[in-house]
Swiss-Prot record:
This is Ribonuclease HII. InterPro entries: RNase_HII, RNase_HII/HIII, RNase_HII/HIII_dom, RNaseH-like_sf, RNaseH_sf. Its EC number is 3.1.26.4. GO terms for cellular component: cytoplasm; ribonuclease H2 complex.
Length: 212
């Protein structure tokens, strides 16, 4: 099985087309039952690219933390979120795209080309974009964005766990693990749970149906 590592090929191609501010964009947190969806936009500079960049899911938590700190030092970084309320109102796909747009808008330099993880380019970004399937494993800028987004969201979930103990958010990051689902049944949903997601919705419906 061939092991792929992200490289600078996609950035080089965009720069060769005449674009001058090329950034990578990725999001994390589409699947969890709780917490925001978080996106990051990162502009890397040749000669200052941290070693070891890869899809955040392939890295240990300590390694992600180290790389995120380095990325913040050597690159232009913007992190943005879409709230649980926005996820429930819009749907998770549209909320993810909203977070991506906010991340792009928050960069100190205005990008003229965005490399986006996935198969779909969000509408209305106001930038030239290219979607790259598995981009976080193929493109260095997207890999960097995946790392800083993951670290930022994990920190949010650790903070939320202190406010709402018992759901295991420090370790499950809001995903629907067995322990998290059991806690939902025992403790009920919090304001940070996504009511539009089926496991949470079902518990709320069950509670409503048995209430006096």
């Amino acid at each position: 099985m061939e092991i792929t590592c992200p490289d600078w090929t996609h950035e080089t191609a965009a720069l060769a087309e005449g674009f001058t501010c090329v950034v990578g964009v990725d999001e994390v947190g589409r699947g969890p039952l709780a917490g925001p969806v978080t996106a990051a936009a990162v502009r890397l500079f040749p000669g200052r690219i941290p070693e070891g960049l890869n899809d955040s899911k392939k890295l240990t938590a300590p390694r992600r933390e180290m790389l995120a700190a380095e990325i913040h030092t050597v690159a232009e970084v913007s992190i943005a979120h879409a709230s649980v309320e926005e996820i429930d109102r819009l749907n998770i796909l549209q909320a993810s795209h909203l977070a991506m747009g906010r991340a792009l808008a928050g960069l100190p330099s205005r990008p003229d080309f965005a490399l986006i993880d996935g198969h779909m380019v969000p509408k209305g970004l106001g930038h030239r974009c290219r979607a790259i399937v598995k981009g976080d494993a193929l493109c260095l800028s997207i890999a960097a964005a995946s790392i800083v987004a993951k670290v930022a969201r994990d920190r949010i979930m650790v903070d939320l766990e202190q406010q709402h103990p018992g759901y295991g958010w420090r370790t499950n990051a809001g995903y629907g693990t067995k322990d998290h689902l059991q806690a939902l049944l025992n403790l009920g949903p919090t304001p940070h749970h996504r009511r539009s997601f089926k496991p949470v919705h079902n518990i709320l419906y069950q509670e409503a149906s048995i209430s006096p």
